[in-house]
UniProtKB/Swiss-Prot annotation:
Protein name: GTPase-activating protein gyp7
Highest taxon of the lineage: Eukaryota
Name of the encoding gene: gyp7
Protein location: Cytoplasm; Nucleus
SUPFAM superfamilies: Ypt/Rab-GAP domain of gyp1p
Native source organism of the sequence: Schizosaccharomyces pombe (strain 972 / ATCC 24843) (Fission yeast)
Alphabetized UniProt keyword annotations: Cytoplasm, GTPase activation, Nucleus
Pfam families: PH_RBD, RabGAP-TBC
PROSITE patterns linked to this entry: TBC_RABGAP
Biological classification of the source: Eukaryota, Fungi, Dikarya, Ascomycota, Taphrinomycotina
């Protein structure tokens, strides 16, 4: 009988891209534990998911055998590899059934397969265990390697398909009369793996982040991991400093498994430490020489090591505020590019605990548990999908909410917008047939022509009505400076029809835009034309390429944005107040900083909200954003969450690199045309669900207090939720008075 000791020994090899494997004779190892239905999610599409087996196996230790886990391999093998190896597949299945390590049989571990890996436990620095939420979202793990600082592809446990997890969970419930694990989570595949790992390695759970475990930590790792000493140093520095730099919420962390070193808790320490450029030179030197800093530095990317050790960089950032701003913008650019390229894998795999777990503000010292909804971006609605949703009479035969969900999560193919936007802008009813829409179009076309004739054929009005002349001049001026880089408006190939105009040239598209806006001025006699409307009209005009349809699309959009253009600015005040309340409710630290910099009026968001981010995103990207906003899928005022997401994605720069109103305003203005849409939308959706869950938690605690307070004498510490905030959960238009106040 062959013993484990007689097995040929593997040599570890790192493979580029997504594969880390081992080289051993015949690639044979002895299997100890196996878990099926563990998936890699290469993209956001379910069809691309790759199923496989996660396993623990035995090999001979390399080097010092006293190191725990040096002879144990953690591996992932795709099902496709085992499909043509029935004997190996049987071993994996048997190991999963027993899952107690009593059967140890040789199996083959593949080499150079995409996403497959096999690493020694002693080579793993930490593992993030992210449990499922609501009982349906997949739990996942992220494995962070010790020497390279790399993270392996995130692994997702499809527990609803895994027989061993289902059966073991039932067994635990029977034995303990409790379906939860030690951390209070429902039993899931990651819990099963954790139980097995503890047999072969020392795992230390973070006191700051319960989902993070160090594997065989050294004393230096433990010190850096807990970060207590470094926190004391930073606290002392603050006491000795004349100006206290802002710090992030203690539990705020974003783990991105595709960025080197950012995933380790040591980077959380570094993130605190990186603000030393705000301290004096003595504090910088003191931190650089601290033993905790020295223990972390070797694990960081080379670029960061050079940056932190550079006295020239430290001196430059101490002497020149613009240098701090430049470095901050550079860092933001790196993050922006990374998230733009890897938005879905990053956000599916990371740990997003963007709010305090212990809230000590007006909510009282109770635990806030945010339930993470699955957030993903998908492919845009295609022509084929759209056509398949209608019957032979051209009537929608699927649920409208389903259609809106597809658009919300992926947008619309550009060639299809002309057909879909009329539904989103309430030009056509969702339950209409093709024939009914044809009749509606003809009726709307006639109504548009009638409205246009009211001013177009009134010569007296054109030359003597002072109000009309003023409005026409405003429209003329605005149209001639709207989107002049777009091909529709770029070339002036016609002489201006009015010889008295200050503009000598024009083109047909600009003239049609003027006509539509003058007709809208006739349609909405109360509001008329207000500067900024030309910015809103241009995308609709280019998309529809039909004057009547464009006009009624503009009417639909203005029903949504009417209050933005009121003379008393009450609508804009309401929106900015809502955004202000949202920031204060969700991120008190950021709100306090905005107050400190005299920026809590949020004037930096005025343009974004006024014209629906028209100047913040490039043309094609803007249209995709409008696809999302027009759906009202999660909220009628979802643009408030988009604005909040922009603030959150840039919060660290705002907190650490801005100190006055003009700096905040300048920073936001310079974001124009540089924002990445997909990460912003993912962040906005996460923020929405966090807001919704926090609101529900407060309401639940309010109800509990009310039920327990029979005589009504007990005062509550819970915050009062403003109506503006509650309106953010509505998917239909909230009712406001003409002054913009809520009825």
């Amino acid at each position: 009988m062959t013993t484990l000791e007689s097995l040929d020994m593997p040599e570890m090899t790192e493979v580029e891209d997504d594969t880390v494997d081992i080289h051993i004779d015949n690639s044979k190892v002895a299997l100890l534990f196996s878990k099926s239905k563990v998936f890699v999610h290469p993209t956001s599409k379910m069809k691309d998911n790759i199923s496989g087996y996660l396993s623990l196996s035995k090999s001979k230790a390399l080097g010092n055998s006293s190191v725990a886990g040096s002879d144990i391999l953690l591996s992932w093998v795709p099902d496709s590899f085992l499909k043509n190896r029935p004997r190996d597949l049987s071993v994996f299945q048997n190991a999963e059934t027993l899952s107690n390590g009593s059967i140890r049989e040789w199996v083959e571990i593949p080499q150079h397969l995409d996403y497959s890996f096999s690493v020694r436990l002693c080579s793993i620095y930490s593992i993030i265990f992210r449990p499922p939420r609501y009982g349906w979202n997949y739990g996942s793990i992220v494995i962070n390697l010790r020497d390279s600082g790399e993270s392996l592809p995130p692994l997702f446990f499809h527990d609803d398909e895994c027989i061993s997890t289902i059966e073991y969970g039932k067994q635990i419930t029977r034995d303990r009369f409790d379906p939860f694990d030690e951390s209070g989570n429902m039993f899931w595949g990651g819990t099963h793996l954790l139980m097995q790992l503890k047999k072969y390695a020392s795992l230390e759970q973070s006191s700051h982040e319960s989902q993070l475990y160090l594997v065989n930590p050294s004393p230096e790792d433990t010190v850096a991991f807990q970060s207590v000493e470094l926190q004391k140093v930073i606290s002392n520095n603050r006491l000795n400093s004349s100006s206290t730099p802002p710090t992030p919420r203690s539990s705020s962390s974003i783990f991105n498994p595709f960025r080197r070193a950012l995933h380790d808790l040591s980077f959380t320490v570094l993130e605190r430490f990186s603000r030393v450029t705000n301290y004096g030179k003595s504090e910088v030197d003191r931190l650089m020489e601290h033993k905790v800093t020295k223990s972390i530095l070797p694990h960081l990317p080379r670029e960061l090591q050079v940056l932190l050790e550079s006295k020239r960089v430290q001196k430059l950032t101490e002497e020149y505020d613009p240098a701090r701003m430049f470095l901050a913008r550079w860092a933001e650019g790196i993050v922006e590019q990374s998230e733009s390229n890897n938005s879905q894998p990053v956000n599916n795999a990371g740990v997003w605990t963007d709010a305090q777990r212990e809230e000590d503000s007006s909510l009282g010292p109770f635990e806030l548990v945010y339930i993470e909804e699955r957030v993903k971006r998908d492919d845009p609605l295609s022509v084929e999908q759209w056509n398949s949703m209608f019957n032979a009479h051209g009537k929608l035969q699927v649920d409208v909410h389903r259609v809106l969900g597809i658009i919300f999560h992926g947008g619309i193919q550009p060639s299809l917008r002309k057909e879909v936007w009329p539904f989103l802008l309430s030009v056509y009813p969702w339950d209409s047939t093709s024939e009914e829409r044809r009749v509606i179009y003809l009726s709307l076309q006639e109504e548009y022509c009638t409205l246009k004739r009211k001013w177009y054929e009134d010569i007296h009005k054109q030359f003597n009505d002072r109000w009309f002349i003023e409005q026409r001049n405003r429209i003329e001026k605005d149209v001639h400076r709207t989107d002049r880089q777009h091909e529709y408006f770029q070339i002036e190939d016609l002489p201006h029809p009015d010889p008295q105009s200050t503009f000598t040239g024009t083109n047909m598209n600009m003239e049609m835009m003027k006509d539509i806006l003058l007709t809208y001025n006739e349609y909405d006699t109360e509001l008329g034309y207000v500067q900024g409307m030309s910015d809103l009209l241009a995308p609709i005009y280019v998309t529809f390429n039909d004057n009547a349809l464009t006009f009624w699309g503009m009417v639909g959009l203005m029903k949504r944005l009417h209050f933005n253009f009121l003379r008393d600015q009450s609508g804009m005040h309401r929106q900015l107040d809502t955004l202000r309340l949202l920031i204060e409710f969700m991120d008190p630290e950021l709100f306090a900083h905005l107050e400190k910099t005299d920026s809590s009026n949020l004037f930096c968001f005025f343009r974004m909200l006024l014209i629906y981010f028209k100047r913040e995103f490039d043309w094609e990207v803007l249209l995709k954003l409008w696809d999302v906003l027009f759906t009202n899928y999660l909220s009628y005022d979802y643009h408030i969450f988009v604005a909040y997401a922009i603030a959150e994605r840039h919060r660290e720069v705002l907190l650490n690199q801005t100190s006055a109103f003009d700096e905040v305003l300048k920073y936001f203005n310079e974001l124009s045309g540089k924002l990445a849409l997909e990460p912003t939308l993912i962040c906005a959706e996460q923020c929405f669900y966090q807001f919704k869950n926090k609101l529900a938690l407060i309401d639940r605690k309010q109800m509990e207090e009310t039920n327990s307070d029979e005589d009504g004498s007990k005062e509550t510490d819970l915050p009062t939720i403003a109506p503006y905030l509650r309106n953010l959960l509505k998917t239909s238009q909230p009712q406001y008075t003409p002054s913009g106040k809520q009825e």
